[in-house]
Amino acid sequence: MNLILVDSKLQYAIQKLNDANFFTVDCCEGHFENQIPNTYISFVKNRKFVDAPKGFKIENGNVLRYIYKNTKSKTEFKKEQEEVINNLNKWVDYLTGDN
């Protein structure tokens, strides 16, 4: 078993995805202070997702990515990030049948 570092805001989604055999290899919640204005999850293999969480794009069949729009201040970023993570978690619950 390979272990990956998981940002705290993504722990719920990553655990649920891996438990449901949607295996992940990399992820980032996005960090204002490091000028990383996106949240993403990379999967081991291409997934045939019918849809993505609200605001996310599917890249190359194996990456879900959200690029932040409100990055002018840390407060705006954190507010948008909270909404993004909530949308992601709702999508994960739907995908894994826990809705």
Language-model segment annotations:
Residues 1-6:
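Terminal, regulation- and interaction-focused segments at domain boundaries
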Residues 7-54:
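Amphipathic, interaction-prone secondary-structure segments
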Residues 22-34, 61-65, 93-99:
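Short glycine-rich, low-complexity/disordered patches
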Residues 34-46, 62-79:
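Short cationic amphipathic helices and targeting signals
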Residues 53-61:
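Short glycine-aromatic motifs
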Residues 65-99:
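Ampiphathic alpha-helical segments that act as solvent-exposed interaction surfaces
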